[in-house]
């Protein structure tokens, strides 16, 4: 039985996706037989994310519109289609080392908690340097993701929405920091590791997100909006 689905968004990251697939294939049978991977292209204008056999089930979806910073919708789609009890939600520029993945799959943890990871940065010379934990990488059960409500797609188009999701995580679960780490890949190592198409922390983010929050508050007993964007399946491979 497969235990975990690794979920990450894609946006014009062909080189980084190839590196992800290379690292996943290298896990070995003991990990791959428990793993599935879902990639969601959140509207890349330069072509679709390309799939290939990676040794475990791989599914790729693509959102049909190109919206600034729409990785929240991508994560919702991935979680919706996952069939494993556990999810690992992260970004495409974060690699899960074999030791971390083996520890995740080989350890029974309370399903009532949500888990975060330490982080290292991959340097150009291959060394790893300590880096602050990623604020939007999560290990949790699919059932708990549903209870939290997933990501609220009202905030589509804004950078920094991970804080809103984290606030709701704190309302439903204890967050536990694990000693294992993820590896951040900067653009100095892989040029398309992360997007340069859209700016981060723009004025529209500072002013727009509070307006969405205020409008949402008027709804009273609101629930997060999910699966609001059209999408299609691009690729599926059993292994």
Task: Give residue ranges: language-model regions.
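Donor nucleotide-sugar recognition loop
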Residues: 149-167
């Amino acid at each position: 039985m497969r235990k975990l689905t690794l979920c990450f968004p894609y946006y014009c990251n062909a080189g980084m996706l190839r590196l992800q697939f290379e690292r996943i294939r290298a896990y070995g049978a003991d990990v791959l037989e428990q793993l599935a991977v879902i990639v969601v292209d959140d509207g890349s204008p330069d072509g679709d994310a390309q799939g290939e056999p990676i040794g475990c089930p791989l599914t790729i979806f693509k959102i049909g519109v190109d919206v600034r910073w729409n990785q929240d919708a991508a994560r919702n789609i991935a979680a919706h289609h996952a069939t494993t009890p556990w999810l690992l939600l992260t970004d495409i520029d974060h690699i899960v080392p074999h030791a971390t993945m083996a520890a995740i799959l080989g350890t029974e943890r309370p399903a009532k908690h949500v888990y975060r990871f330490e982080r290292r940065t991959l340097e150009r010379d291959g060394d790893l340097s300590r880096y602050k934990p990623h604020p939007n990488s999560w290990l949790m059960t699919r059932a708990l993701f549903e209870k939290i409500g997933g990501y609220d797609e009202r905030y589509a188009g804004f950078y920094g929405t991970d804080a809103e999701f984290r606030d709701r995580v704190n309302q439903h679960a204890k967050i536990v920091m694990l000693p294992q780490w993820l590896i951040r890949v900067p653009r100095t190592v892989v040029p398309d590791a992360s997007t340069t198409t859209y700016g981060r922390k723009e004025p529209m983010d500072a002013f727009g997100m509070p307006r969405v929050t205020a409008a949402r508050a008027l709804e009273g007993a609101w629930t997060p909006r999910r699966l609001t964007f059209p999408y299609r399946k691009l690729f599926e491979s059993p292994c």
